[in-house]
């Protein structure tokens, strides 16, 4: 999963640079080890992503993150949805 996540993040940042999308990038992790793998902030807003190579694994949205940031959606990116994530403007 770590290699998959690193590749997706690198490709997403490249896509944004090529398409002149100004964005800032973060990750979020709590002391209880809940995490959001990737957070992208741009003029359209903020979105969180969790990366799972196995598309059969269900998305577990971190409850702590949702409590503190209810307006930020968290999406799952897997082998079936990665292309739309990489090319999203």
Show where each model-derived region lies.
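A cross-kingdom feature that marks ATP-driven nucleic-acid transaction machinery
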Residues: 1-89
């Amino acid at each position: 999963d770590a290699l998959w996540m690193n590749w997706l993040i690198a490709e997403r940042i490249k896509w944004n640079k090529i398409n002149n999308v100004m964005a800032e990038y973060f990750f979020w992790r709590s002391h209880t080890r809940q995490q959001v793998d990737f957070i992208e902030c741009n003029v359209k807003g903020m979105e969180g992503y969790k990366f799972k190579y196995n598309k059969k694994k269900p998305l577990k949205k971190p409850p702590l993150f949702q409590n503190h940031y209810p307006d930020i959606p968290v999406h799952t990116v897997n082998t079936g949805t990665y292309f739309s994530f990489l090319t999203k403007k």
